[in-house]
Amino acid sequence: MQPLQLSHKGFKAYDIRGVVGAEVNEDLAYRVGRAYAALYHPQAMCVGYDIRPSSPAIAKAVMRGLTDGGADVMDIGLCGTEMMYFATFHYGLSGGIMITASHNPSNYNGLKLVREGGIPVSADTGLKDIEALAFSGDFPEAERKGKTFARQILQDYIDCILSFVDGTKMKPLHIVADAGNGCANIAFAELKKHLPFTFTELYMEPDGSFPHGVPNPMLEECQKPLKEKVLEEKADLGIAWDGDFDRCFFIDENGKFVEGCYMVGLLASYFLKRHPGEIIIHDPRVFWNTEKICRLYGGVPVESKGGHAFMKETMRRVHGIYGAENSAHHFFRDFSYCDSGMIPWLIVTELMSETGRHLGEMVAEMEKEFPVSGEINLPAKNVEKTLAAVKAAYAPKALAIDPTDGVGLEFENWRFNLRPSNTEPLIRFNMETMGDRSLLEEKKDEIMKLVEESNR
């Protein structure tokens, strides 16, 4: 084939994602399929896709590339990313490809690639090789042409997800669920049949034009309808998912967004109470609460660089039972170390049923003991210069310096992490203190001002 004339901007650290036409198209998808087949020689793959208008055609193109490269392909159709992970490890396939751009606007699309067992193909583990071969078009001739076959995986997937909780403990709850017009209702509609809950549903209809805004519950404007509905309905809990439902977000009974670090601590306590001594993986952003939970219940906290590929690699290496990023990615050993947006809320409802306490009550002490800033995105023209300026100002007085991801500095009763975004000219800022909200505000403003000044 001729070399591909297309921007390379779609190739990110963990996946391929970009504007349809300019950065991602059917030609690229076909070539990625061919390159994957040429480099890894898979026997059988699965391919799934999300609800974006461009997804079915891109999925067909990548399947054609895989079969032309000699691989058989299981077409699992419209699904969430974790369903692609599930199909890969549950059916013993050589790998999988998901067509999705997660929470990005509808004019974006992308490809998420995994090997056997759901192991990610990222820039450090083969994605750059796939990029080079896809753009060169220098594919070897396959010895045979692969075949495509369709398979319905939903029921097997649902059975797996339900196995993470004890259904006999579930008690009636009123829950508001918001799918943001993404894929979540594919799984949610089937899961709810097995649960004794009353649901009020928001934006469940899959619609890749995202008429109610991008499906990104990290954004306050996306949380607003869910918060209002929880209060209006006097519901027990609010849950929301991003576009491909590999992330799950929580609104408590008071209509308040629960920061990811407290959800990590809560789920860590769930696993450690049942499996004392196990290993819990956390990212470098804010983790004092998670460390305390581990000490309390006899667990072992292990830090990993942020990003799903790094988290999964660390979990596999140390055999962690559970891991999470504060960005709402939750990873489970018994889900082949992959992330799921459905397992977390089932665990939370089991905890609520078991204890008779609402989510807000369960995290209140954590919020008081370890207040956090939440993740703040700060523009940075020169990321390295900005990080160096902050480090020069604060490192001399730090009790500990953590180079795991960006700049992490720890002091007597506060700490912060600044790390570059993998995809945008931004620095992501997170901070926590030991019970001191006024110190949190003081130091947060101080550091944000320094970042702003270093960009002038």
Task: Give each language-model segment a name.
Residues 1-64, 68-70, 148-173:
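An N-terminal, well-structured beta->alpha segment
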Residues 107-131, 251-266, 335-346, 352:
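A short, gly/pro- and small-residue-rich
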Residues 109-233:
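Gly/Ser/Thr-enriched, mixed-charge loops and adjacent short helices
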Residues 127-159, 163, 253-326, 330-332:
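Proline/glycine-rich low-complexity loops and linkers
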Residues 275-456:
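Phosphate-binding and adjacent anionic-ligand microenvironments
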Residues 44-50, 74, 174-176, 278-284, ...:
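Short glycine-rich phosphate-binding loop at a beta-alpha junction
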Residues 45-109, 162, 191-251:
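N-terminal small/polar loop signature for handling phosphorylated ligands or for N-terminal nucleophile
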Residues 94-102, 108, 230-252, 257, ...:
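Glycine-rich phosphate-binding loop
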